[in-house]
């Protein structure tokens, strides 16, 4: 079986399990149990592989807890960020799950122990609260303890039955792929709410490539509204690990999604010392402001997010927003995320941000912010995407690419709204579409009906309108008429009509003659 076939088979199996174990509970409400259990299995097997160190004679899960010395535990936590005793390993808990009458409390105790093992270590904040949404007492699992344990046992057995093979690098990828697949399907079924925490994989790939284009190495990559971390991890998938020197950084407002993002990092084999995901409102309580600026920023922020705006007089003096001289509209904070990203960008950096199209042509504060961005030569490219690419919205969104190292004062506009493949419920961006966009993004060449590099003066004269349709002429798909051929066809038709008229006259004359 090829790796592609293996992935496809695994995805079918895991989605079937996810639907089977949830029973009558909505999949969106049950996701943390399936995702959390997958994560529990991953960190157990990852930890066992580390302890065993390639010695096939050692089976960590078969050891007794009493053989673990304080030195072994201390060293493991410093390296892996957490500790799991043999008795707490996923395989052991899953094996006795069906007959364990205290399964729900045992799981809660194990998760608490894993989290607390990091207390006092550098990994404490990366591990703390990871299992907070895995509520073993929730009525979503059932009304009685027996019902709860039965549902939990079903989830454990289902995840235990997934065939990831031996725990090596290729199968580590399978864990990450399975997790991303689950998140993607949950997001697709959740509609709008799902779109707020997951960016479709192909769009993520395009955004990551735009942000890191031309870079032989970057210090770190950042997403100010990171959701489940899918955008950040696309950078890891697209580029060798050594290119991203100091790792992955992000901030997320939603507590459940924040935990999903941290789990996602571990599941993609990003060690605790190579990521920093923080919880909180990026616009009001930003993290990383005192850190070294980022060489790459990617983001798909929530659309039309509400900003405190005029209600918070301190924001206009905030170093992120003050240079523009105006705040983003209170009910549409899209440009607040753009200005935030710009302020965190290094002098060699590039940011690629998903934006709703309205911010590129509306007046008022948004027009003033566009003027600030264009006058200071920060806008490298605006790309319009096809409609219905994202979960939760059918609108065709755009990608705004900001740069602090442009070599000219032109702004590039790319109309990629026609690049998509129609699928059952959504449109999809293909690899060939991404290559087409990246090719013209790199060359900055003008392509009729697709891409145009526009001088600063032209954008300024157009009231700083950044709508692609203002600069890239849409292709006229109406049929081109050949006038000469049309005239020839008309002449032939007229001749034929005249002949038919003569034939009819002759027939009529013949009939009238017979009647006489």
PLM-predicted stretches and their roles:
Residues 193-299, 304-315, 320-325, 335-336, ...:
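Conserved S-adenosyl-L-methionine
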Residues 25, 41, 47, 182, ...:
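Conserved NTP-handling cores and scaffolds of large molecular machines
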Residues 1-206, 210-211, 215, 273-282, ...:
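Non-catalytic, mostly N-terminal accessory regions of nucleic-acid modification and defense proteins
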Residues 20, 162, 181, 185, ...:
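Conserved, well-folded catalytic cores of nucleic-acid-processing
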Residues 3, 145-148, 167-171, 196, ...:
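Alpha-helix initiation/capping motif
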Residues 5, 285, 289-516:
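A conserved structural/catalytic subdomain of Rossmann-like adenosyl-cofactor enzymes
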Residues 90-94, 261, 400:
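Hydrophobic alpha-helical packing residues
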